[in-house]
């Protein structure tokens, strides 16, 4: 029960911005996109 509550709390907190769950994927996605772009450009160039 506690574990289930924690999971729900994390999910509810994620959109709030208190949990690193949401900001992490957002930052990671941006970093990955930028890195991918540079990698592709380097490969093409």
Swiss-Prot record:
It comes from Halalkalibacterium halodurans (strain ATCC BAA-125 / DSM 18197 / FERM 7344 / JCM 9153 / C-125) (Bacillus halodurans). It is found in: Spore core. GO terms for biological process: asexual sporulation; sporulation resulting in formation of a cellular spore. It comes from the Bacteria. It holds the Pfam family SspP. This is Small, acid-soluble spore protein P. Residues 1-45 are annotated as: Disordered. Belongs to the SspP family. NCBIfam families: PRK09399.1. The gene is sspP. The keyword Cell inner membrane does not apply. Residues 1-12 have a biased composition (Basic and acidic residues). InterPro entries: SASP_SspP. Its main location: other. Keywords: Sporulation. HAMAP family: SspP.
């Amino acid at each position: 029960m506690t574990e289930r509550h924690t999971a729900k709390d994390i999910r509810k907190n994620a959109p709030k911005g208190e949990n690193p769950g949401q900001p992490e994927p957002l930052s990671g996605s941006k970093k990955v996109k930028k890195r991918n772009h540079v990698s592709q450009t380097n490969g093409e160039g």
